[in-house]
């Protein structure tokens, strides 16, 4: 005899196109990206931020320059510099801020992510 089992429903992916600013790209981060793009000598570059499995907390952030924008990428422009995020990564980054900080301990890009339940000590991986 077979039994029907109902599966839990999955919430639909957020419609980032209807949100005014689903991700914040700070002026400080944009300025640093502009500087790095100028060093590369390719004005067509944008900074891509993505999430991948790994790190001590389960997920980790990745950054890379990209000339190609996919049709479904979110593009956030700050001071003429573009940040790209793919839809899968955006689910984990909704409401986050991409910033750049300089301190006595060094300079780095920082993601302040309200969706991260825990982060590792170095700040490069998180869990949800």
Swiss-Prot record:
It comes from Xanthomonas euvesicatoria pv. vesicatoria (strain 85-10) (Xanthomonas campestris pv. vesicatoria). One of its GO terms (cellular component) is cytosol. The keyword Metal-binding applies. This is Iron-sulfur cluster insertion protein ErpA. It comes from the Bacteria. NCBIfam families: iron-sulfur cluster assembly accessory protein, PRK13623.1. PROSITE patterns: HESB (PS01152). Pfam families: Fe-S_biosyn. Its cofactor is iron-sulfur cluster. InterPro entries: FeS_biogenesis (IPR000361), FeS_cluster_insertion (IPR016092), FeS_cluster_insertion_CS (IPR017870), FeS_cluster_insertion_RrpA (IPR023063), HesB-like_dom_sf (IPR035903). The gene is erpA. SUPFAM superfamilies: HesB-like domain (SSF89360). GO terms for biological process: iron-sulfur cluster assembly. GO terms for molecular function: 2 iron, 2 sulfur cluster binding; 4 iron, 4 sulfur cluster binding; iron ion binding.
């Amino acid at each position: 005899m077979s039994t029907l089992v109902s599966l839990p429903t999955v919430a639909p992916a957020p419609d980032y196109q209807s949100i005014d600013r689903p991700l914040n790209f700070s002026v400080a981060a944009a300025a640093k990206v502009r500087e790095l793009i100028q060093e590369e000598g390719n004005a067509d570059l944008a900074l891509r931020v993505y999430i991948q499995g790994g790190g001590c907390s389960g997920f980790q952030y990745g950054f890379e320059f990209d000339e190609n924008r996919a049709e479904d990428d979110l593009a956030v422009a700050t001071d003429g510099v573009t940040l790209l995020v793919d839809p899968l990564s955006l689910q984990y980054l909704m409401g986050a801020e991409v910033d750049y900080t300089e301190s006595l301990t060094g300079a780095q890009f920082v993601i302040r992510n309200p969706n991260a339940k825990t982060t590792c000590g170095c700040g490069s991986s998180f869990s949800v």
